[in-house]
Amino acid sequence: MNVIEISNIAAACGKNPYEDRQKIMLLLLCRKYKEIYKKEMKKIGIIEYISHDIKTFDTEIKEMYSEHKRNVTNPKEFKQIEKNITDKIKLKKEITKKDLDYAKIFIESSLKKDCGTNSEKTVIKKQLYTKGNNCMFSFVNNEYNWTIRGFHDATDNDIVIEIKTRMKQQNVRRNEYDLYQLFGYLLAMNKTRGKIVQYFNDIVYDSDIPTFTEFGIIDITVEPCKSKFEEFIKELNLFFQELNTYSDTHLINIEDIIKKNEWPIALYDTTDTPHNISPAYEKIINSI
């Protein structure tokens, strides 16, 4: 059975402009054929093995960042936090430009993710929602051999709430990929109504009716959402049909997905431990 996280559904259906459909396919194939894809990535040069005398600083960078992880709630804080950490890491004698480049990418990616997580708590408290993330919900499609699973953010009575923290005012908008993620939770939780709630600059956008920037309450039993939801199911089926054309002898073209200018996406030491993992490919590295 092929399993996909609900957070990856929009990309799998080709609706996420920031995450390629084939990349999600590669992730699932890496989980299924771990050693085969790891060996192939090593042969191509997508991952590199380093000798014992080469030092990496990713562990120290993560430790420095951990001081800020639980407290960041405002995108305006990002630049100062990044500067504080990079100033500290620059004091290390053996630090290289590559290490600093990795630090910048890791910090930027982590700040966005953790700011979103921390802001969810604020929104849930403000709006008096019932907090989610208390159990894993899943849905199994036996006909096409796939399972979706995930933890929802919150509920408001019978309405499933998906919270999105925006980094800029212009990002407060209706995104199709957010809608697809909500569809995934509705399917997994066996619910029919949901709402995408946005948060920016201490303002919660939670209109029940559609506006220029908000979907309002989504009801998959009523048009136009009913047809859109049916289309979503078809696209998910097509994704898994294509995924099943690959095997342990017929691999997906990795070089088409991970471009050469992004290599290496991780450095492996002599104990086979990965370091300097590219945040964009962290799930893939963790899968192998």
Regions found by a protein language model. Name each.
Residues 1-288:
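Accessory terminal regions of nucleic-acid processing enzymes
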